[in-house]
Amino acid sequence: MRILLSNYDGVHAPGIQTLAKALREFADVQVVAPDRNRSGASNSLTLESSLRTFTFENGDIAVQMGTPTDCVYLGVNALMRPRPDIVVSGINAGPNLGDDVIYSGTVAAAMEGRHLGFPALAVSLDGHKHYDTAAAVTCSILRALCKEPLRTGRILNINVQDLPLDQIKGIRVTRCGTRHPADQVIPQQDPRGNTLYWIGPPGGKCDAGPGTDFAAVDEGYVSITPLHVDLTAHSAQDVVSDWLNSVGVGTQW
């Protein structure tokens, strides 16, 4: 198995290095990751400037000022030859649950892999300690995929509780929960008296009930949420069409 491995928090982050070491026990792994933390980059792609890369002695590649999406795009289309069989993103330091997936660079890297036609996993640890647990879970899933491919055409968003492996209760297939809207902005002043603004923390849990990714992780399970790129709200199409007809939009300007 040939794996393109990326992340959002940089080529030297403990999560990606722990996972790369574990994956190399049974797979051909090419790391292509940002040279620095690009948290919250989501699906941004660098289009107005060129990108430089640096290759380390062990073969890992850092993309200077690159986003996670840049890294996967370059990895698939230029830097990994032959091309990968699968794209893996992580291990993220902190969870990507509920609405987090909208902003997540970790999920975005996996999404770019899927957009380019490859199976893709996004892996996050709900903490900063037991990266080995998340790595073991990921390796188990990838070994299973080697034996029997999963042909859903979906991204698997994997969240692992920050526990020793023997304390993980199992795996649950989940849906995304939701958070309350974030509303905190933290103002500060620079030495010249100018006001600076920091984006505050995410909103608290809103829908974290049974079946959600929040609930699974809180209860000590691995959460696997299938995600897809198509954002169409199919169930709303007829509602919108009927509304347009009723108000006359499209027939009178």
UniProtKB/Swiss-Prot annotation:
Reaction it catalyzes: a ribonucleoside 5'-phosphate + H2O = a ribonucleoside + phosphate; a ribonucleoside 3'-phosphate + H2O = a ribonucleoside + phosphate; [phosphate](n) + H2O = [phosphate](n-1) + phosphate + H(+)
Cofactor: how bound: Binds 1 divalent metal cation per subunit.
Keywords for this protein: Cytoplasm, Hydrolase, Metal-binding, Nucleotide-binding
Needed co-factor(s): a divalent metal cation
Cellular component aspect of the GO annotation: cytoplasm
UniProt binding sites for a divalent metal cation: 9, 39, 92
Pfam families assigned to the protein according to its UniProt record, in alphabetical order: SurE
Gene Ontology MF terms in the entry: 3'-nucleotidase activity; 5'-nucleotidase activity; exopolyphosphatase activity; metal ion binding; nucleotide binding
Tagged with keyword Ribosomal protein: no
EC number in record: 3.1.3.5, 3.1.3.6, 3.6.1.11
Leading EC class: hydrolase
Classification via SUPFAM superfamilies: SurE-like (SSF64167)
Location of the protein in the cell: Cytoplasm
PANTHER family: 5'-NUCLEOTIDASE SURE, 5'_3'-NUCLEOTIDASE SURE
Biological role stated in the UniProt entry: Nucleotidase with a broad substrate specificity as it can dephosphorylate various ribo- and deoxyribonucleoside 5'-monophosphates and ribonucleoside 3'-monophosphates with highest affinity to 3'-AMP. Also hydrolyzes polyphosphate (exopolyphosphatase activity) with the preference for short-chain-length substrates (P20-25). Might be involved in the regulation of dNTP and NTP pools, and in the turnover of 3'-mononucleotides produced by numerous intracellular RNases (T1, T2, and F) during the degradation of various RNAs.
NCBIfam families per the UniProt record, alphabetical: PRK00346.1-1, PRK00346.1-3, PRK00346.1-4, surE
Family according to the record: Belongs to the SurE nucleotidase family.
Protein name: 5'/3'-nucleotidase SurE
Organism name: Shigella flexneri
Gene from which this protein is expressed: surE
